């Protein structure tokens, strides 16, 4: 049974940022991720010669701390500026993309981190002043502290399955957090799209909310677009999937002026936080006798890539101070 200072459940951006900062602070750590890859919504897909960003399409940098990291990434070639202005833009500032794709950001941060993939946390249990976590593969890990960076409903599921009782005010904060869902279609086109430069379009009042041209973006050699839908979870759950896909594709073709030759899909159940917590992280064991238990992610004071990064950054400092 492995023993570490901090177990991090979830290897999205918040998780890997926190992991690296804790490792730099000389803490022993272990990250676990139920998926087959790290990065969460910093995701990409390749098929039939096309390359797609499937989740987050770009990011901005406004916090000075984050700007310093982005500057280093630009210098090292990990990210590039995609664009800063476009017709009808309400503000002019750089929008960055990963190079070659968004997932490289998480991979770059996670280079030295111990990460177990395809490992789902089932229960956490208190063992005196420490935690014992049980996993779907029958492994167990002992840790002084736990950080959960999954979407909050998944974190709550782990906590409830474990019969861990939180302070009522903390639980109320967590229960308030909600997410919107998104159906993503990655489509190969029969010719280059007519989406205006720089290769993205945001759409209101349609079944489609966003289209990115991955060829114009510079990540796909052949014409390929990523389509994000305007759907809530119940609309998706109750729909005939093939009919839904065709409706989304037909709508997107009106904007791309090109026909879809082939496509693949992905449903983002927790695409973007609708209701967020006001703080960068949640100290879930506060006002209890529980060992250190923290939650972080893009639902904490910032629903974007930058928010996820800063949440992981600051929660790592809080955990380090807690364990000192």
What are these model-derived regions, one by one?
Residues 246-247, 251-291:
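Flavin (FAD/FMN) cofactor-binding core of flavoprotein oxidoreductases
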Residues 23-47:
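Glycine-rich FAD pyrophosphate-binding loop
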Residues 58-64, 87-108, 238-244:
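Short beta-strand to alpha-helix junction loop
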Residues 4-31, 316-320:
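N-terminal Rossmann-like FAD-binding beta1-loop-alpha1 element of flavoenzymes
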Residues 39, 145-198, 258:
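Central helical "cap/lid" subdomain
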Residues 186-237, 247, 252-255:
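Active-site substrate-recognition segment that forms the wall
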Residues 7-9, 32, 141-155:
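Short hydrophobic core segments
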Residues 117-131:
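A conserved short coil-to-beta-strand element within the FAD-binding core of flavoproteins
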């Amino acid at each position: 049974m492995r023993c570490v200072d901090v177990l991090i459940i979830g290897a999205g951006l918040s998780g890997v940022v926190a992991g690296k900062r804790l490792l730099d602070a000389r803490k022993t750590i272990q990250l676990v991720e139920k998926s087959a890859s790290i990065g969460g919504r910093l995701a990409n897909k390749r098929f039939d010669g096309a390359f797609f960003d499937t989740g987050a399409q770009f990011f901005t940098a406004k916090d000075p701390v984050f700007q310093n990291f982005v500057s280093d990434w630009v210098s090292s070639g990990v990210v590039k500026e995609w664009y800063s202005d476009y017709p009808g833009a309400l503000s002019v500032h750089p929008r960055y993309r990963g190079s070659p794709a968004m997932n490289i950001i998480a991979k770059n941060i996670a280079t030295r981190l111990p990460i177990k993939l395809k490992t789902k946390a089932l229960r956490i249990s208190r063992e005196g002043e420490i935690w014992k976590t049980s996993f779907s593969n029958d492994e167990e890990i002992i840790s002084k502290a736990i950080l959960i960076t999954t979407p909050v409903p998944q974190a709550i599921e782990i906590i409830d399955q474990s019969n861990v009782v939180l302070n009522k005010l903390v639980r109320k904060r967590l229960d308030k957090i909600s997410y919107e869902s998104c159906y993503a279609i990655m489509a190969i086109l029969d010719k280059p799209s007519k989406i205006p430069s720089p290769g993205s379009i945001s759409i209101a009042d349609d079944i489609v909310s966003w289209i990115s041209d991955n060829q114009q973006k510079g990540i796909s050699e052949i014409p390929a677009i990523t389509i994000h839908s305007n759907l809530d979870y119940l609309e998706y759950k109750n729909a005939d999937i093939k009919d839904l896909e065709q409706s989304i594709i037909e709508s997107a073709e009106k904007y791309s002026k090109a026909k879809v030759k082939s496509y693949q899909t992905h449903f983002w159940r927790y695409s973007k936080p609708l209701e967020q917590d006001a703080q960068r992280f949640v100290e879930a064991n506060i006002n209890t006798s529980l060992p250190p238990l923290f939650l972080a992610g893009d639902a904490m004071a910032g629903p974007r890539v930058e928010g996820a990064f800063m949440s992981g950054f600051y929660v790592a400092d809080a955990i380090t101070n807690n364990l000192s």
